[in-house]
């Protein structure tokens, strides 16, 4: 949802939009809660409170002050990520298609011949990093840029088997127009750019697990972050390959040679980071014009020094000349060298050309060895061709996509490789590597061993759920790692599937109850964003590939109403209640009936079951930004940090009742996942609360009334306001609590309206208006370790007779309380108080 705050109303009506006017009788938190549970996507918030907007944004719900109709129109028609700390809106808006335009934030693409293969009459526009160059399009009171681009389509094409780019792009655009917006992909880059600067500033050592190419620019600024990926393809791994011949396959219609060079250099940079944790000087020989240097320097500043007879316009220092062996002495330590020397073939006969290429390969390799032979802190990436070669067994083979698969590949070497054992690799084996292996990631660091690291902050976004990881190891890491941000795939199946398919692999699935943490926040993507100064206009879908975000060691853990809070907890319930249910009271009625409470008079105000817990369980797929386990735990240890809002503390038994209702709901819906989740939450409640039951009571609290509007034959008709199991020396403690609640007890609005048979031979009158006070008293007894209440639900009633009688219905009648007393069962009254 998105909340657009205005000082005055607008005449125009928008689809999927509700209006909310600030309620001055409620505080900012209560207004935020009410707004978050509205059911439309767009909320126009009039006479707004800035504090309410802050609360919504911290909850991950985008809420923005609007100063003009143009701002309103722009934000109401598309989704976006909002940096509420810096007042920057990142639109995810593809309406630029109506200009016959596709967009990119990679400059090198604009220097290719890609426009020859676009849809007829279409053009390519460069918009800068995250759409930074579009800021001039929006003259708004907040900074605004459109981060939507088509780079995902272009990059997917490069790695696909498709050759016809126009048809590929047409299909992908049509898919984009008919499926839901991939909001997480668009928003994730904004999130990463906010997340990692904060982590590096706060923590000495940061580990990042499973980065992919989407993050390759983000981490250029962070050489100290240790990356873990799937590992490199080593020379020694070629032993598994069978010999093949030259294939000669076209990969892309437009020239992507620059993409290949960029990926090679960035791979080399990250290998250098892994070894030395600092930025290198970047030396490049050949590969002009290297327009991609502009892209790298848009994200992070490097010193590029290049040699090539052709211009290299974005190099820091360019030598418009050839590079020779004698020039190696000019290269400094703490550097990387990229060797991409290859003479143009021209009209040379292919046999003669092959001899030239093989000689250049030997020379290139010799340059690499000489560069690495002296000095320190060096890494080299060198172009080679498929031929009989002796190569270090530990060297890394690279084959990033290029325009055509021919005979070239690249070798990544460091100082240790040069001194390692060399192995003879036949030409046919290298052709087999070239023909069958594509390097699909610039991060080639070793795989992460799933174990705790107490001195590190571990980040693992979308990286650990794969079923080739041991599920128990993942759980153990999350349970024991002191500081981390880890995601795992949420179990949003209906059959409680332990793993689900994703692309060509399987992911383990998880529920919050799979983890045993006491200092971690478990939330959704949008809930996590709120903790890092961001919010989003589109929440995660209830089905599909969604993840739990688990933050260990966060300083926001105790701020229960500010982060991963209960905003939106009833939104799904409201959607169903007013569109599909038999009555808008369906939820209340079901919760009471499923706990054998058949008095439904005033069911929407006389709550005996926690609606929060019930909704958090049965609709967890929609509202898992709310960290239910944390909410339960902090209440159980009485460390709830509440800043504001209408606060009601549930008695633990109310939470148990909610679990029982949720289990019955799950059985009726055949929802095995909710059934397990509700069972495990009930077990968790019993674990963190020391709940005892007076199922064999020896005392009770009774309430006598001045007026009983029914015929009765018992000696003293009374309301049993709870039973106790106590020792005699605890009586003073019970009396003290009763006295402390005297005003509230006598202030109850107690009513009755009918009689019924509670069971065979027990004729009773119903009682309404006492449950809220009962549960408050329950809490006081619980905190004083006094056993109060039974395991079955408390059903308030007045016993009238021990004979069977017909039901009588009367007008709702107020009962006047005469006295409240503590009495021993089959014994004496120990305490009695009147108003």
Curated annotation (Swiss-Prot):
PROSITE patterns: SAM_MT56_VP3. Residues 171-245, 429-555 are annotated as: N7-methyltransferase activity. Coiled coil: none annotated. GO terms for cellular component: viral nucleocapsid. It catalyses: a 5'-end diphospho-ribonucleoside in mRNA + GTP + H(+) = a 5'-end (5'-triphosphoguanosine)-ribonucleoside in mRNA + diphosphate; a 5'-end (5'-triphosphoguanosine)-ribonucleoside in mRNA + S-adenosyl-L-methionine = a 5'-end (N(7)-methyl 5'-triphosphoguanosine)-ribonucleoside in mRNA + S-adenosyl-L-homocysteine; 5'-triphosphoadenylyl-(2'->5')-adenylyl-(2'->5')-adenosine + 2 H2O = 2 AMP + ATP + 2 H(+). It is found in: Virion. One of its GO terms (molecular function) is mRNA guanylyltransferase activity. Its main location: virion. One of its GO terms (biological process) is viral process. Its EC number is 3.1.4.-, 2.7.7.50, 2.1.1.56. The keyword Transcription does not apply. Residues 246-428 are annotated as: 2'-O-methyltransferase activity. Keywords: GTP-binding, Host-virus interaction, Hydrolase, Inhibition of host innate immune response by virus, Methyltransferase, mRNA capping, mRNA processing, Multifunctional enzyme, Nucleotide-binding, Nucleotidyltransferase, RNA-binding, S-adenosyl-L-methionine, Transferase, Viral immunoevasion, Virion. Pfam families: Rotavirus_VP3. Residues 556-692 are annotated as: GTase/RTPase activity. Residues 693-835 are annotated as: 2'-5'-phosphodiesterase activity. The active site is at residues 718, 720, 797, 799. Multifunctional enzyme involved in mRNA capping. Catalyzes the formation of the 5' cap structure on the viral plus-strand transcripts. Specifically binds to GTP and displays guanylyltransferase and methyltransferase activities. Has affinity for ssRNA but not for dsRNA. Capping activity is non-specific and caps RNAs that initiate with either a G or an A residue. Together with VP1 polymerase, forms a VP1-VP3 complex positioned near the channels situated at each of the five-fold vertices of the core. Counteracts the host innate immune response thanks to its phosphodiesterase that degrades the 5'-triphosphorylated, 2'-5' linked adenylate oligomers produced by the host cell IFN-inducible 2',5'-oligoadenylate synthetase (OAS). The host RNaseL is therefore not activated. Belongs to the rotavirus VP3 family. Contains a bipartite N7-methyltransferase domain, a 2'-O-methyltransferase domain and a GTase/RTPase domain. The C-terminus contains a phosphodiesterase domain that degrades the 5'-triphosphorylated, 2'-5' linked adenylate oligomers produced by the host cell in response to IFN stimulation. Interacts with VP1. Interacts with VP2. This is Protein VP3. It comes from Rotavirus A (isolate RVA/Human/Belgium/B4106/2000/G3P11[14]) (RV-A).
């Amino acid at each position: 949802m998105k909340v657009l705050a205005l000082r005055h109303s607008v005449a125009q009506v928008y689809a999927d939009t509700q209006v909310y006017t600030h309620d001055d009788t409620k505080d900012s938190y209560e207004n935020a809660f009410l707004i978050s549970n509205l059911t439309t996507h767009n909320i126009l918030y009039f006479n707004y409170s800035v504090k309410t907007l802050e609360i919504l944004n911290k909850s991950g719900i985008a809420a923005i002050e609007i100063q003009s109709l143009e701002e309103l129109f722009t934000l109401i028609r598309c989704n976006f990520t909002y940096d509420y700390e810096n007042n920057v809106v990142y639109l995810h808006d593809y309406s630029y298609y109506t200009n016959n335009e596709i967009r990119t934030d990679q400059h090198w693409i604009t220097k290719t011949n890609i426009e020859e293969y676009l849809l007829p009459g279409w053009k390519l526009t460069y918009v800068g990093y995250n759409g930074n160059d579009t800021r001039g399009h929006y003259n708004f009171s907040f900074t605004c840029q459109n981060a939507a681009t088509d780079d995902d389509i272009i990059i997917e094409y490069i790695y696909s088997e498709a050759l016809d780019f126009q048809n590929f792009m047409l299909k992908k655009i049509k898919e984009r127009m008919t499926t839901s917006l991939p909001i997480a992909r668009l928003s994730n880059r904004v999130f990463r750019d906010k997340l990692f600067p904060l982590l590096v500033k706060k923590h000495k050592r940061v580990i990042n697990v499973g980065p992919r190419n989407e993050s390759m620019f983000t981490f250029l600024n962070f050489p100290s972050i240790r990356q873990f990926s799937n590992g490199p393809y080593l020379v020694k791994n070629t032993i598994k390959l069978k010999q093949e011949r030259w294939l000669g396959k076209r990969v892309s219609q437009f020239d992507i040679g620059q993409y290949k060079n960029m990926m090679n250099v960035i791979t080399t940079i990250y290998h250098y980071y892994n070894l030395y944790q600092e930025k290198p000087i970047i030396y490049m020989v050949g590969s002009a014009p290297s327009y991609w240097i502009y892209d790298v320097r848009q994200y992070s500043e490097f010193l590029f020094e290049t040699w090539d007879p052709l211009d290299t316009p974005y190099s820091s220092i360019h030598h418009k000349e050839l590079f020779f062996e004698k020039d190696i002495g000019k290269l400094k330590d703490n550097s990387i060298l990229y060797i991409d020397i290859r003479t143009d073939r021209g009209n040379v006969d292919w046999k003669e050309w092959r001899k030239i290429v093989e000689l250049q390969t030997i020379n290139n390799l010799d340059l690499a060895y000489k560069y690495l032979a002296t000095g320190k802190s060096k890494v080299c990436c060198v172009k080679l061709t498929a031929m009989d070669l002796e190569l270090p067994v530990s060297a890394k083979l690279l084959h990033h996509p290029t325009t055509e698969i021919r005979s070239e590949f690249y070798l990544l070497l460091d100082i240790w490789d040069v001194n390692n054992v060399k192995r003879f690799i036949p030409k046919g084996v290298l052709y087999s590597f070239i023909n069958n292996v594509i390097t699909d990631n610039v991060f080639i660091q070793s795989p992460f061993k799933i174990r705790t690291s107490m001195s590190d902050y571990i980040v693992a976004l979308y990286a650990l759920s794969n079923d080739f990881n041991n599920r128990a190891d993942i759980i153990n890491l999350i349970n024991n790692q002191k500081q981390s941000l880890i995601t795992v795939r949420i179990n949003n199946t209906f059959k409680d599937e332990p793993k689900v398919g994703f692309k060509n692999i399987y992911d383990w699935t998880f529920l919050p109850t799979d983890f045993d943490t006491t200092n971690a926040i478990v939330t959704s993507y949008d809930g996590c964003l709120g903790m890092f100064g961001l919010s989003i206009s589109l929440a995660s879908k209830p089905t599909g590939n969604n993840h739990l975000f688990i933050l260990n060691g966060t300083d926001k853990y105790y701020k229960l109403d500010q982060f991963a809070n209960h905003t939106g907890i009833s939104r799904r319930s409201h959607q169903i209640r007013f569109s599909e249910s038999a009555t808008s009271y369906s939820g209340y009625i079901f919760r009471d009936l499923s706990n054998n409470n058949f008095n439904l008079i005033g069911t929407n105000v006389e709550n005996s079951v926690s609606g929060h817990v019930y909704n958090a369980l049965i609709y967890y797929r929609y509202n898992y930004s709310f960290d239910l386990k944390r909410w339960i735990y902090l209440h159980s240890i009485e460390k709830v940090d509440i800043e504001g809002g209408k606060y009601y503390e549930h008695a633990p038994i109310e939470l148990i009742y909610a679990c029982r209702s949720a289990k019955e709901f799950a059985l009726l819906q055949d929802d095995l996942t909710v059934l397990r989740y509700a069972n495990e939450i009930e077990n968790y409640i019993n674990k963190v609360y020391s709940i005892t039951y007076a199922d064999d009571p020896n005392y009770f609290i009774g309430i006598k009334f001045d007026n009983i509007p029914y015929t009765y034959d018992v000696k003293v008709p009374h309301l049993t306001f709870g039973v106790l199991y106590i020792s005699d020396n605890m009586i003073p403690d019970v009396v003290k609590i009763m006295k402390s609640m005297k005003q509230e007890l006598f202030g109850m609005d107690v009513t009755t309206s009918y009689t019924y048979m509670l069971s065979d031979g027990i004729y009773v009158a119903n009682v309404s208006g006492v449950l809220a006070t009962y549960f408050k008293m329950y809490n006081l007894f619980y905190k004083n370790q006094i056993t109060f209440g039974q395991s079955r639900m408390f059903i308030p009633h007045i016993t009238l007779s021990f004979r069977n009688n017909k039901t009588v219905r009367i007008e709702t009648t107020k009962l006047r309380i005469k006295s409240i007393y503590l009495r021993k069962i089959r014994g004496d009254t120990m305490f009695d108080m009147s108003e």
